[in-house]
């Protein structure tokens, strides 16, 4: 199915889930809309208050994504999808957290993890047992297991595999056609 790891968590939990999406940019917002259209309650986190305000008003913050201007308004007005700048408002009690924070690469093609590290720390500080954390940003091989699993455990005090599940399921979509790609490409 198109929801991948979210479907796995849903099967364990029941039909409707509370999903937090961290990073409401050109990939994160369409993913959040996709989950909300699937019947889930979604809270998005973004550091940009302007983006958060526009999403909550049902206004597309960055034009160009096919169908986003059509799908977003009814989800925002119904409360199925909302956004916040506060991790404490989105993460506690979430069944799944989807990390879609950009990973910047410097001029020598080295990844700069500072933004993702900060987002992971902020998310982990509010993580509750039973949550699935899925990294969907494209990351170097081994980063989820070697960098983010230990960081989540350190900050949250929770143990991966016992208290929380941490997975890597990179997005396979392109901006401008996210909804079509989600329907077209299966996810693990």
What does each model-identified segment do?
Residues 6-60:
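NAD(P)+-binding Rossmann beta1-loop-alpha1 motif at the extreme N-terminus of oxidoreductases
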Residues 62-77, 155-165:
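Short mixed-charge
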Residues 67-95, 105:
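A structured beta-alpha segment of the ubiquitous adenosine-cofactor-binding alpha/beta core
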Residues 92-93, 129, 184:
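Alpha-helix C-terminal capping/helix-to-coil transition sites in glycosyltransferase folds
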Residues 93, 99-101, 136-137:
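Short, well-ordered coil/turn residues at beta-beta hairpins
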Residues 99, 165, 172-188:
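Dinucleotide-binding Rossmann-like beta1-alpha1 core, especially the glycine-rich loop
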Residues 105-172:
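Rossmann-like NAD(P)(H) cofactor-binding subdomain of soluble oxidoreductases
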């Amino acid at each position: 199915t198109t929801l991948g790891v979210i479907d796995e968590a849903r099967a364990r939990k029941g039909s409707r889930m509370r999903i937090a999406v961290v990073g409401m940019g050109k990939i994160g917002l369409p993913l959040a809309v996709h989950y909300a259209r699937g019947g889930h309650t979604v809270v998005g986190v973004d550091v940009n208050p302007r983006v958060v305000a526009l999403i909550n008003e049902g206004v597309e913050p960055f034009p160009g994504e096919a169908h986003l201007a059509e799908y977003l308004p009814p989800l925002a007005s119904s409360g199925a999808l909302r956004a916040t700048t506060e991790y404490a408002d989105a993460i506690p009690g979430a069944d799944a957290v989807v990390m879609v924070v950009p990973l910047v690469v410097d001029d020598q093609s080295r990844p700069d993890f500072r933004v993702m590290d900060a987002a992971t720390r902020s998310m982990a500080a509010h993580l509750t047992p039973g949550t699935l954390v899925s990294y969907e940003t494209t990351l170097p091989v081994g980063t989820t297991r070697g960098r983010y699993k230990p960081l989540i455990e350190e900050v949250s005090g929770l143990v991966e595999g016992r208290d929380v599940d941490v997975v890597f399921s990179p997005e396979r979509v392109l901006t401008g056609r996210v909804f079509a790609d989600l329907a077209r490409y299966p996810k693990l």
